[in-house]
Regions:
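Bacterial signal peptide processing site
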Residues: 20-23
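Central antiparallel beta-sheet cores of small beta-barrel/beta-sandwich binding domains
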Residues: 33-185
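Sec-dependent bacterial lipoprotein signal peptides
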Residues: 1-18
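Helix-termini ("caps") and immediately adjacent flexible loops/tails
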Residues: 25-29
């Protein structure tokens, strides 16, 4: 009888301990996601970075590079994602598409927005990769000039170059892409 009680107590203790163990996620899953998306900024670099001169990739023209605010980066890096908006995005216009009237004036009627599959953003660099059905793999690597950006922000945007980089879409690469800053509407 005592043996049955001891065996029952041992089984009960084993089940109690087993229920306390936490389920583990596959090794590397969260680290892999967070490693693909990284921002380490100490200043507000948010805004629209627009080409100083036209940048063409086939029929597509770069409209802007967008950098969000710190909270938008944190939301994305925390796993909350949108299919239409990211903290770093590139937008292209189909230069062959008809022009239409918008609240900001005339714009091409067909655009392609490229959301990130990877980014690394600091106070002085922007490294971005994404994909779009229209352009395929898109990459941008740029150097940000903090002093020029500070001047542009004080002046609420101007024509001065604040970032210079290399843009690749599909199999075409454009070097020395020069961007100015605009805070947006």
């Amino acid at each position: 009888m005592h043996t049955r009680i001891l065996i029952g107590a041992a089984l009960l203790a084993t089940f109690a301990l087993a229920s306390c163990e936490r389920a583990t996620e596959p090794a590397g899953a969260p680290a892999a996601i967070s490693a693909a998306f990284n921002h380490t900024t100490t200043a507000d670099i948010s805004g629209y970075y627009m080409p100083v001169e036209p940048v063409r990739i086939g029929q597509w023209s770069l409209d802007h590079l967008f950098l969000g605010q710190a909270s938008e980066f944190e939301t994305w890096e925390g796993g909350s994602r949108s299919e239409t908006f990211g903290p770093v995005m590139l937008q292209f216009d189909d230069a062959a598409s008809p022009m239409v009237a918008t609240e900001l004036g005339q714009a091409h009627s067909v655009t392609a927005r490229v959301l990130p599959t990877r980014y690394d953003v600091t106070d002085t660099t922007v490294s971005f990769e994404g994909r779009s059905p229209e352009l395929g793999r898109v990459a941008f690597d740029g150097r940000l000039d903090p002093d020029a950006l500070a001047t542009a922000r004080r002046n609420l945007g101007d024509d001065g170059v604040v970032m210079t980089g290399t843009l690749t879409a599909g199999r075409q690469t454009v070097r020395d892409v020069r961007l100015r800053w605009w805070m947006g509407d």
